[in-house]
Swiss-Prot record:
Membrane topology field: Multi-pass membrane protein
Family: Belongs to the complex I subunit 4L family.
Entry keyword set: Cell inner membrane, Cell membrane, Membrane, NAD, Quinone, Translocase, Transmembrane, Transmembrane helix, Transport, Ubiquinone
Domain of life: Bacteria
Enzyme Commission code(s) on record: 7.1.1.-
Compartment(s) where it occurs, according to its Swiss-Prot or TrEMBL record: Cell inner membrane
Protein's UniProt name: NADH-quinone oxidoreductase subunit K
Amino acid sequence: MTLTLGHFLSLGAMLFALSVIGIFLNRKNLIVLLMAIELMLLAVNMNFVAFSYYLGDMHGQIFVFFILTVAAAESAIGLALLVLLFRNKSNINVDELNSLKG
């Protein structure tokens, strides 16, 4: 059995749907929300790689490296902010972080 473009796109769609479900079902823990957002970015990256491979164009695969770089920086900044919130509030639940409201 060979893997076709449809297999990769369906896997990417399933990963994207799983991350959306993770965002909607878990609205309490910020770390799990950050992980769900990262899973969403990885699903989109997988679709970019699949399309660029099957079209014979390297631009999609090069674009994925830029997206992964930005995602790594986003994760590092997000985790640093979560560590600061945990140090100040000793809690990272979304419901109890109402001091951030403007």
